[in-house]
């Protein structure tokens, strides 16, 4: 059924509910915002290019704290560096509740390390952090895994020299294999059919979640969930991924050695066995399944998407790529493999990677939250369970911190002496208690993959760099890089 028809039906049904129930009552004192229409809320003020653009425009008119109505549902928007930091750092506990993403709700059901709330989340987070310590962040092993994967990518690119190709698939392979190594304890060949199927499902799902149709579903999910649409396609895709995860979990269970856990799944299974008599434990099969699903989806797509944007920017600004290569040649040379220790000696390359993350802005709104208790924030009383979005894009493009916020310029992260400078507006992984748990791995991947590729290859575009369009393929909860062609030429 056409989206416009479903939307009309949704409005009509909402009108009937409005007549029966009247206005929803909200105690507290929500911040003002654009005047909503009955039933429609602020829908007509939303840009089809994505809600993010609309929220930035509303920020200019209503300030950093305002309320937008998704249909009849009030949602508080927080914009600007200082506002977001105040909420997520100074009021961290109050803003730590995870909100619901309607298109994912049927499959996630508030389970998993990123979708549970309060105490349940803290328990699973501790396990995840411990597992990343043992199998990922802070260990030489994860750096070795990334370097080995980068080596495989360099070898694969030899098969494509001089040929224009879409790099999306290859970037998915390398980031997907790092997550697979940590979660499943194995990596896959780039031609493995099962691996390719999983990557295709994840990419299509990521694009669907970021689509305008998905944003419309967030507004009218109570009605649209009964009809065919983007939510059912997402469910179908993720159900197939879950079937694979379930099969892997059973294989892990059959070969589990309590004295030698191999990966995240093994570690979780050991906790399940330890707490099998606890009826209230968070270590149960479905939490394991959803945690692995989310790690696989977020860990693969967000980093590969950033790499796609990064190399598109190198095509558009070839002088930047040349300057990065000059620093690589000076610090690393052509023979030695890049290491994470090189970061401290390569301020320009680090500034370029930071600017890629800032400019590409792949997670413009982060994940929604719900207030855990009645909270006085900037003069407004936000009731418990108030839905809140943090417009991270407004910080990454904050003119108070970035002289040219809408221009790609690595100088944003360099001081007068050419050293890398910190910036509190830089929050691509969010901040506070709910910041991305995989930040350390993602930062390591971006540096090692980026430098290894440019150490071995120069890049060129089959089109004039001045004509390269940076408009995202989709822009919603996430921004999906546009499809493009790139040519890798051995140095």
Swiss-Prot record:
GO terms for cellular component: cytoplasm; endoplasmic reticulum membrane; intracellular membrane-bounded organelle. It comes from the Eukaryota. It comes from Rattus norvegicus (Rat). Induction: Constitutively expressed. Keywords: Endoplasmic reticulum, Heme, Iron, Membrane, Metal-binding, Microsome, Monooxygenase, Oxidoreductase. PANTHER family: CYTOCHROME P450 2B6, CYTOCHROME P450 508A4-RELATED. It is a peripheral membrane protein. Its EC number is 1.14.14.1. Cytochromes P450 are a group of heme-thiolate monooxygenases. In liver microsomes, this enzyme is involved in an NADPH-dependent electron transport pathway. It oxidizes a variety of structurally unrelated compounds, including steroids, fatty acids, and xenobiotics. The lineage of its organism: Eukaryota, Metazoa, Chordata, Craniata, Vertebrata. Belongs to the cytochrome P450 family. Pfam families: p450 (PF00067). GO terms for molecular function: anandamide 11,12 epoxidase activity; anandamide 14,15 epoxidase activity; anandamide 8,9 epoxidase activity; arachidonate epoxygenase activity; estrogen 2-hydroxylase activity; heme binding; iron ion binding; monooxygenase activity. Gene3D superfamilies: Cytochrome P450. InterPro entries: Cyt_P450, Cyt_P450_CS, Cyt_P450_E_grp-I, Cyt_P450_E_grp-I_CYP2B-like, Cyt_P450_sf, Cytochrome_P450_fam2. This is Cytochrome P450 2B3. GO terms for biological process: epoxygenase P450 pathway; ketone metabolic process; response to Aroclor 1254; response to bacterium; steroid metabolic process; xenobiotic catabolic process; xenobiotic metabolic process. Its cofactor is heme. The gene is Cyp2b3. Liver. Not found in the lung, kidney and prostate. It is found in: Endoplasmic reticulum membrane; Microsome membrane.
